[in-house]
Amino acid sequence: MRRGLGVCYYPEQWPKSRWKDDVLNMKNLGISFVRIAEFSWAMIEPKPKEYNFNLIDEIIDIIGKNDLKVVLGTPTAAPPSWMIELYPDMLPINQSGLARQFGSRRHYCFSHEKFVEHCEALVRVMAKHFGENPYLAAWQIDNEYGCHDTTISYSSLALAGYRKWLKKRFSN
């Protein structure tokens, strides 16, 4: 794999009319890699099992046609609001017993089976859709794991998951 300088880019935060100029500026500055999509789950899957990759396809095409490569993030760090509406028990619980609220990233309990199922489904669909794209240089699996004190949950789901893991790990 070639080496080079990379940037993070969030095309969903900018008007499409700006994308080509932004990518051209990246190219002129010597950028080689552009990381995208790590927080775009709500855009990619606005409703359960309804996937729309149009914006991601479009920006990947612009990036690639300007001789830059894409690092594609799996957006599992930021589940969409519909998921919290379907599974309100998915919110992690802090040490004081309060639920982390929707609106940032990592607003889920890692032990929630439905969260894991939705992550797996999303990543499989993304792999099928983007897997052969010649402009992709790499995949970024998840994003900022452990940031902002978000990996620990004191929820009953986390406790049950931990006990299940212990039983698998230790037979006695």
Ranges and model annotations:
Residues 1-5, 30-32, 64-70, 132-137:
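Short, well-ordered coil/turn segments that N-cap beta-strands
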Residues 14, 19, 41, 139, ...:
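Tryptophan-centered motif/residue detector
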Residues 4-16, 37-55, 99-120, 145:
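The substrate-binding groove and active-site-proximal loops of carbohydrate-active enzymes
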Residues 65-67, 79-172:
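Active-site region of glycoside hydrolase catalytic domains
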Residues 8, 35, 73-74, 138-140:
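Short beta-strand segments
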Residues 1-18, 24-32:
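An acidic-aromatic substrate-binding cleft motif
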Residues 20-100, 124-127:
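Aromatic-lined substrate-binding rim segments of carbohydrate-active enzymes
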